[in-house]
Swiss-Prot record:
Quaternary structure and partners: Homohexamer; trimer of homodimers.
Gene Ontology terms describing biological process: purine nucleoside catabolic process
Gene name as annotated: deoD
Keywords: Glycosyltransferase, Transferase
A single Gene Ontology CC term: cytosol
SUPFAM superfamilies: Purine and uridine phosphorylases
Residue numbers binding phosphate: G20, R24, R43, R87, V88, G89, T90
The protein's name in its UniProt record: Purine nucleoside phosphorylase DeoD-type
Family: Belongs to the PNP/UDP phosphorylase family.
Binding site for a purine D-ribonucleoside: H4, E162, E178, M179, E180, S202, D203
A Pfam family hit: PNP_UDP_1
Marked site positions, Important for catalytic activity: R216
Superkingdom of source: Bacteria
Function statement: Catalyzes the reversible phosphorolytic breakdown of the N-glycosidic bond in the beta-(deoxy)ribonucleoside molecules, with the formation of the corresponding free purine bases and pentose-1-phosphate.
Length: 234
């Protein structure tokens, strides 16, 4: 057991999906995994392990933001030796050619979080996805005929930010805004593990188009299937 995850070591697979919402973790386990059992309920952050096409897979809620996901992925790697971590989450588009429900593969992320500047003594470390995971996910998405976008995302430290620089970020090619990828990629690099963020556009910051909270919790199956297929091909 770790501080925030109440599982025994053998109860968590070495490949894991990471939704922010614990109810989405429950949905993934019940919808896609066979024989899924719940290994964690600490703080209501649900975690499950089951099989997908004969491969053992876990899914763990992480909460929102850099501090929360950092706790869970650190404990998953440090205490449970998880090797492959794939975030499945939502993001807000800031490019006109990125549409609601498009799937984004985050190649890298920039951030206004101070996490890496504190870690690297002021250096602007550039967190990146694992290339094997990124390439595999892209190929799977194309096989499925999905509207995939590959590029940079922005990991925001604040959800409600009156001084957001979204227009400038868009000019520099950033596709969308979310709140966790920088932490995932940085910590995966620290521990020598594979990581990827597979994101569904839940709303468009420029146009105001959005999905409902219920849709964000229980849909976006294409993203989940891409993540699961990517995990089992590793």
């Amino acid at each position: 057991m770790s501080v925030h995850i109440g599982a025994k070591e053998h109860e968590i697979a070495d490949k894991i999906l990471l939704p922010g919402d614990p109810l989405r973790a429950k949905y993934i386990a019940e919808t896609f995994l066979e024989g899924a059992t719940c290994y964690n309920q600490v703080r209501g952050m649900l975690g499950f392990t089951g099989t997908y096409k004969g491969h053992r897979i876990s899914v763990q809620g992480t909460g929102m933001g850099v501090p929360s996901i950092s706790i869970y992925i650190t404990e998953l790697m440090q205490s449970y030796n998880v090797q492959t971590l794939i975030r499945v989450g939502t993001c807000g588009a800031i490019q006109k050619d990125v549409k609601v429900r498009d799937v984004i593969l985050a190649m890298t992320s920039s951030t206004d979080s101070q996490m890496n500047r504190m870690t690297f003594g002021g250096i602007d470390y550039a967190p990146t996805a694992n290339f094997d995971l990124l390439k595999t996910a892209y190929e799977i998405g194309k096989e499925k005929g999905l509207q995939l976008k590959v590029g940079s995302v922005f990991t925001a430290d604040m959800f409600y930010n009156e001084n957001a620089q979204f227009e400038k970020l868009a000019r520099y090619g950033v596709l969308a805004v979310e709140m966790e990828t920088t932490a995932l990629y940085t910590l995966a690099a620290k521990f020598g593990r594979k990581a990827l963020s597979v994101l569904t556009v839940s709303d468009h910051i420029l146009t105001g188009e959005e999905t409902t909270a219920e849709e964000r919790q229980t849909t976006f199956n294409e993203m989940i299937e891409v993540a699961l297929e990517t995990a089992i091909r590793q």
